[in-house]
Design a protein with these regions (language model features):
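Partner-binding and oligomerization surfaces adjacent to conserved cores of proteins
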Residues: 1-267
Length: 267
């Protein structure tokens, strides 16, 4: 487990307009499985089967070693990890130009600031590390000829698989909460024909709601009232371009100012 002293005091999660509305109305976090992510390397570990190696190397000459390719079981491992590990992601950066553009839909969404102490009560917060393009992906020998998800060693490896990403993702400065999909903290919600994994957000865990630069005043008021139902001490902010540098800044906004701006814009 990540050393708690090294975890920043605040963690952030970016949302699109529909995503933040749903999150605040239901007061829930969405959990993902590796197979649902947009990164093809998600949990795509190079695991090799000891029994398969023994079987294939018998009688092989060095020039025939090309036939050992079948010992790696990447896709099978990726699917298997989805059975033992679900995760939800956070960032340590609330002023990322890229994440505000992408995850917050060009500043029309919002970013939630979470209290790390409330988040860490799950006891499974881990830091993501990033590999350089030329780095070899780690190889993991399986303890058995088949994938046994109940093995403690395998579950430990599954968490390692989920916390290593390519260097292109470095800008996310990511931490992940990782839990088994069948954890008592996680529930299921039907959306259309599919089921998604969710968990309740502890009361008071949301310490600030940061509005995107392009969020209308009326929407700010609506989101502010939603979040205060379960997080009455939540503060508010608005992200904006710095006047002199190529960076974003977060300006604090009192709730009274949000409501006053709304009444002025409606007159």
């Amino acid at each position: 487990m990540e050393n708690k002293d090294e975890v920043p005091s605040k963690l952030y999660k970016y949302y699109s307009p529909s995503g933040i509305t749903k999150t605040l109305l239901t007061n829930t976090l969405r959990w993902m499985l590796p197979c649902e992510e947009n990164d093809p390397f998600e949990a795509l570990a190079k695991c090799w089967d000891k029994e398969a190696v023994k079987e294939k190397v018998q009688g092989l000459r060095p020039k025939d070693w090309v036939f050992l390719e079948g010992i790696f079981r990447e896709k099978e491992v990726q699917e298997s990890v989805s059975h033992v590990a679900a995760f939800t992601s956070f960032s340590t950066n609330d002023k990322s130009i890229l994440m505000w553009a992408h995850y917050a839909a060009n500043h029309t969404g919002a970013c939630i600031e979470f209290d790390k102490h409330q988040i860490q009560r799950f006891n499974c917060l881990k830091k993501v590390t990033y590999a350089n393009p030329g780095d070899e992906r780690e190889e993991y020998p399986l303890l058995h000829g088949n994938l046994r998800e109940e093995d403690e060693e395998y579950q430990k490896h599954a968490e390692e698989f989920l916390c290593k990403k390519a260097t292109e993702w470095t800008y996310e400065h990511e931490y992940r909460l990782i839990l088994p999909p069948m954890s008592k903290y996680i529930g299921y919600q039907k959306v259309g024909e599919e089921f998604i994994l969710i968990s309740g957000i502890p009361r008071g865990a949301i310490t600030k709601l940061i509005f995107g630069y392009n969020v209308p005043v009326s929407t700010r008021v609506a989101w502010a009232k939603m979040v205060q139902r379960n997080h009455p001490d939540c503060k508010f902010g608005k992200v904006a371009p710095d006047k002199t540098k190529y960076e974003l800044k977060v300006e604090d906004i009192p709730m009274e100012a949000i409501e006053n701006t709304s009444s002025q814009s409606s007159t």
